[in-house]
């Protein structure tokens, strides 16, 4: 899941659509060759996909900011999916057609799970155990179990 925010206007222009663009950087040890320059509307291809946010993806709305969530799946529950490396960025389409992009981030599900687990950042013990049992030990069977604090 990626959580992003967008304001109702950017550069004094109304935002008409917004969403996320995902790129697959590396899977099964193979680099795909994509860069942040490939993460643009109209550049979708084998390793790049863009998704407009729908009403179901809107998490909360304040006076002038919308927080939205998108969940991406790729080879669910496999070592390959957990260790694949991704790139993502948010975009907003303005009323005049201009598209504004955020900076891109790189991540892997495994790296995020490891960070959350090792720092006991999950809100529940069940979530903590899920990371260990479902992701961390699937990639690294000898992963050391950590007590939830």
Can you describe what each PLM-predicted range is?
Residues 1-149:
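Short, surface-exposed linear motifs at loops/turns and structural transition points
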């Amino acid at each position: 899941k990626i959580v992003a925010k967008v304001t109702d206007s950017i550069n004094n222009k109304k935002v008409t659509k917004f969403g996320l663009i995902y790129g697959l950087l590396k899977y099964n040890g193979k680099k795909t060759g994509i860069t942040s320059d490939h993460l643009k509307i109209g550049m979708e291809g084998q390793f790049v996909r863009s998704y407009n946010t729908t009403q179901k993806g809107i998490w909360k709305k304040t006076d002038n900011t919308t927080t939205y969530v998108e969940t991406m799946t790729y080879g669910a529950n496999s070592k390959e999916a957990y260790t694949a490396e991704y790139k993502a960025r948010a975009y907003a389409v303005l009323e005049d057609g201009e598209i504004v992009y955020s900076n891109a981030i790189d991540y892997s599900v495994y790296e995020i799970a490891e960070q959350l687990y090792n720092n006991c950042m999950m809100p529940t013990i069940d979530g903590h155990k899920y990371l260990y049992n479902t992701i961390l030990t699937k990639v690294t069977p000898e992963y050391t179990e950590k007590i939830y604090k």
